[in-house]
Swiss-Prot record:
Record keywords, A-Z: Chaperone, Cytoplasm, Ribosome biogenesis, rRNA processing
Entry's family note: Belongs to the RimM family.
Function statement: An accessory protein needed during the final step in the assembly of 30S ribosomal subunit, possibly for assembly of the head region. Essential for efficient processing of 16S rRNA. May be needed both before and after RbfA during the maturation of 16S rRNA. It has affinity for free ribosomal 30S subunits but not for 70S ribosomes.
Name of protein: Ribosome maturation factor RimM
Transmembrane helix is among the record's keywords: no
Species name: Roseiflexus castenholzii (strain DSM 13941 / HLO8)
GO cellular component, one term: ribosome
HAMAP family: Ribosome_mat_RimM
Lineage summary: Bacteria, Bacillati, Chloroflexota, Chloroflexia, Chloroflexales
Location of the PRC barrel domain: 100-173
NCBIfam families assigned: 16S_RimM (TIGR02273)
GO biological process: ribosomal small subunit biogenesis; rRNA processing
Free-text domain note: The PRC barrel domain binds ribosomal protein uS19.
GO molecular function, one term: ribosome binding
Superkingdom in the source lineage: Bacteria
Amino acid sequence: MEDRPSADEVLLIGTVVDAFGLHGEIKVRSVTDRVDHLRHHVQTVFVGEERRPFPLQRIREPKTGVLILTLGGVTDRTMAEALRGAEVTIRECDAAPLEADEYFIHQLYGLRVVESSGAEIGIVREVLQTGANDVIVVERHGRSDTLLPMIHDVVESLDVAAGQIVVRLLPGLIDEEG
């Protein structure tokens, strides 16, 4: 049996929304756009808070955002229904390689946000996925939080290893009063 990874070693690929059919398949609301990578490079997924390992036998994507997974050991509808609501994760090391301008959402939490001048703005407290682009919620010491879009016009550099995001503030982007 495969070792269960810790919470900081996994990436979310989706949440089980229901059983699918009679033979134990599960329907997953997906948060990944790398289905081909999953299909060809991932052999094990982890399900639920306890990150129980299951062999990934088959994966289909009937429509964008929906996956149908066949997991080893889940052989009937009752077993599949028992997984409803559980998160499905993979080991981070099994994830598709990132492009130069890509990041994993969880990597942004806690990063320092600084202006290109070096002035500190705050710390990333939350990441909102809007569809068009991600937006970071920056907690500013002694001031109200501010929202910054993760777009090329604003983000000059993102260095996870250094723990910071350097931004170029466009006029009106930050409320200096709050």
